[in-house]
């Protein structure tokens, strides 16, 4: 088999309600998850041993130690009895610890690519178990389409059909790790409030999202006040239908109806904040 590549698109939480907490300390979520037309790329080649090369604009942000891609590879090999290797090349474009599932998307792409490379097709339940053992966002990234994500990430339902729309992703290049954000959350839990009807257009989607929220935004701003600055900067761009934080931050996004509007907003933000990571991207449906 020759080499091939698989994309690992950014995950975006359009909504994120914290609805409860398990006895083991894990929080229960109800989240509308979509994917953006920007991400990392994984290239797979046959090899006798398992290896990973990381390149790309944000490769230097990856901490030393075992990469989540290698973890995914080893867990899949254990679950399927595979003894083959693979040469994996990860081109890293997404910022790390950013709330857009970069590592989880990479792990999901690794599972997809290695199943193809190794010629294995584990049962759906086995694959789900492997994905969840890697990380809470890996199952939804493995699905790769708009989903309502519940539980700790293991319960997935297809989302209503979403209209064409564009996003501008903005990260101030401040890593914001998930556990401290959850720990800083205060107040009662939210009710689940899923999107049930397909919005008619991007404006309708923004209206539906505005009636919901990301419960992790206040604690994220408490830890890193720059998140509030990012949201304000996005809100100030022309044609922005909605500014919001994704996941546990620090990446935020603006929602726009048209590509030209998103690109103009990204240019405006980039001129004002050259040190931030800014990327316009289509909302993938």
UniProtKB/Swiss-Prot annotation:
InterPro entries per UniProt: GHMP_kinase_C_dom, GHMP_kinase_C_sf, GHMP_kinase_N_dom, IspE, Ribosomal_Su5_D2-typ_SF, Ribsml_uS5_D2-typ_fold_subgr
A GO BP entry: terpenoid biosynthetic process
Stated family: Belongs to the GHMP kinase family. IspE subfamily.
Keywords annotated in UniProt: ATP-binding, Isoprene biosynthesis, Kinase, Nucleotide-binding, Transferase
Residues given in the record as ATP binding sites: 95-105
Annotated function: Catalyzes the phosphorylation of the position 2 hydroxy group of 4-diphosphocytidyl-2C-methyl-D-erythritol.
EC number, UniProt record: 2.7.1.148
Reactions this protein catalyses: 4-CDP-2-C-methyl-D-erythritol + ATP = 4-CDP-2-C-methyl-D-erythritol 2-phosphate + ADP + H(+)
Protein species of origin: Paramagnetospirillum magneticum (strain ATCC 700264 / AMB-1)
Residues the record marks as active site: 11, 137
Annotated pathway: Isoprenoid biosynthesis; isopentenyl diphosphate biosynthesis via DXP pathway; isopentenyl diphosphate from 1-deoxy-D-xylulose 5-phosphate: step 3/6
GO function terms (MF aspect): 4-(cytidine 5'-diphospho)-2-C-methyl-D-erythritol kinase activity; ATP binding
Class of enzymatic activity (EC top level): transferase
Name of the protein described by the UniProt record: 4-diphosphocytidyl-2-C-methyl-D-erythritol kinase
């Amino acid at each position: 088999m020759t080499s091939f590549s698989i994309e690992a698109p950014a995950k975006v939480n359009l909504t994120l309600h914290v609805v409860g907490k398990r006895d083991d300390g894990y929080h229960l979520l109800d989240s509308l998850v979509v994917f953006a037309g920007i991400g990392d790329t994984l290239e797979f080649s046959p090899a006798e041993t398992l290896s990973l090369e990381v390149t790309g604009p944000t490769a230097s942000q990856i901490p030393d130690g075992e990469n989540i891609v290698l973890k995914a590879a080893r867990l899949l090999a254990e679950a399927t009895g595979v003894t083959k290797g693979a040469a994996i090349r990860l081109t890293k474009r997404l910022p790390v610890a950013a709330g857009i599932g970069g590592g989880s998307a990479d792990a999901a792409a690794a599972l997809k690519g290695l199943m193809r490379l190794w010629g294995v097709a584990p049962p759906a339940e086995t694959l789900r178990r492997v994905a969840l053992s890697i990380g809470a966002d890996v199952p939804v990234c493995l699905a790769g389409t708009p989903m309502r994500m519940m539980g700790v990430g293991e319960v997935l339902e297809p989302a209503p059909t979403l209209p064409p729309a564009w996003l501008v992703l903005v990260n101030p290049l401040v890593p914001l790790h998930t556990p401290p954000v959850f720990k800083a959350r205060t107040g009662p839990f939210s009710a689940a409030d899923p999107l049930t009807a397909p919005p008619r257009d991007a404006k309708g989607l923004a209206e539906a999202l505005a009636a919901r929220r990301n419960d992790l935004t206040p604690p994220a701003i408490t830890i890193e006040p720059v998140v509030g600055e990012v949201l304000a900067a996005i809100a100030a761009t022309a044609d922005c239908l909605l500014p919001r934080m994704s996941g546990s931050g620090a990446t935020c996004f603006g929602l726009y109806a048209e590509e030209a509007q998103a690109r103009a907003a990204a240019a405006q933000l980039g001129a004002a904040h050259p040190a931030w990571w800014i990327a316009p991207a289509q909302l993938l449906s």
